[in-house]
Amino acid sequence: MAEAVFDASAILALLNNEQGAERALLFLGGACISAVNAAEVAGRLEASGLTSDESRDAFMALGVEVMHFDSSLDWIAAGFYQPTRALGLSLGDRACLALATKLNVPAVTTDKDWAKFGFSQIVLIR
């Protein structure tokens, strides 16, 4: 069972050895990510110059389970739209929060604006 849900920003911090990577490592065992956020990671890695195969290999090496974004999650994410609109949270952000809500585990991110939302289980890694 998943123990934490990673946002794309936390995965990218790990892969790029950015500030917060050491803290993110504490949550890596038992971590999962929404397929929406996994697509964000792949896009960012490919934008940085990696091939599709290289980005997939780098991501898969972390051992993070990719979770489907299904109809149970879309309604949870939709419910976060209005309360987070002023904070500028993206669909990816809301997908991560929806999965964390469904699994009742912390969401791991670098995005400080999430703390303003009042979601009780947010881990800011930097």
Cite the ranges covered by each PLM segment.
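Short, well-structured N-terminal submotif of metal-dependent ribonuclease cores
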Residues: 1-33, 45-57, 126
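Acidic, PIN/NYN-like endoribonuclease modules and their adjacent C-terminal/linker elements
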Residues: 3, 97, 101-126
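A generic structural signal for short hydrophobic patches within well-formed alpha-helices
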Residues: 11-12, 38, 114-115
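Short loop->beta-strand "edge-of-pocket" segments that line small-molecule binding or catalytic clefts
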Residues: 30-33, 62-67, 106
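Short acidic-hydrophobic, aromatic-tinged amphipathic segments that line or gate anion-handling sites
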Residues: 66-70, 123-126
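Active-site neighborhoods of divalent-metal-dependent phosphate/nucleic-acid chemistry enzymes
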Residues: 67-108
